[in-house]
Amino acid sequence: GRLSGTQFTPEKGWDENKLEFFRRHIVQLGRSGLFVVYDELAGKEPVEWNYLLHTVELPMEVGKEEGGLRILGKNKADGISIAHLYSSQEMTYAQTDTFFVAALDWKKRLGKALANHYHFTATTTPCNKVFFLNIIDVHGNNRADAVINHQGNRITVEGWVIECNLDSEGKAFLHIENTQNGASLDFNYNSNKGATTIVDQVGGKRIEKRLVDSLPKPEI
């Protein structure tokens, strides 16, 4: 930093890493336009956890629903994205139409000012550990919004049953099943040692695979 003039301070983004664990599970539910994002987060001390979502053209419409938040995003081409956000901790939320740091075309390549985007932030109460579940419904103007039914750790939507830990205690788990087409996903530390088992029907055949984390090889 001496030659470049970089200041290694918390205000400049340099500080002790207080994140102890992070794992994200992303699942596409067939071709339904539904996606499941399940996050496990743990810190070395109680902190407020933030969950961010963004839109480019139009502001989001945010409201509370059973056990969580409903965040509706649209664009000017009739694209719709609805995030159904749940957490193991209570959440407050806010939305702004300005960047945390102003976007500058410092190379002068665009020839125009950069428009502000819209930024949603959900914030939890201070805690060491948190689970987030986000069920995202993406579609155009060709169908109605998917209907979400939420009861505790169980959610049903369009023939899919989603179960996960949304309590403040216990280990993370994620189980997704569609009884109509036989597809399923199971992630569980206790019964599956942290591996993920997926079952699907491909070309009329039942396919089962076991997925585990694969760490990248170091470059040096």
Where are these regions (language model features)?
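CBM-like, beta-strand-rich accessory domains located in the C-terminal region of large
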Residues: 1-220
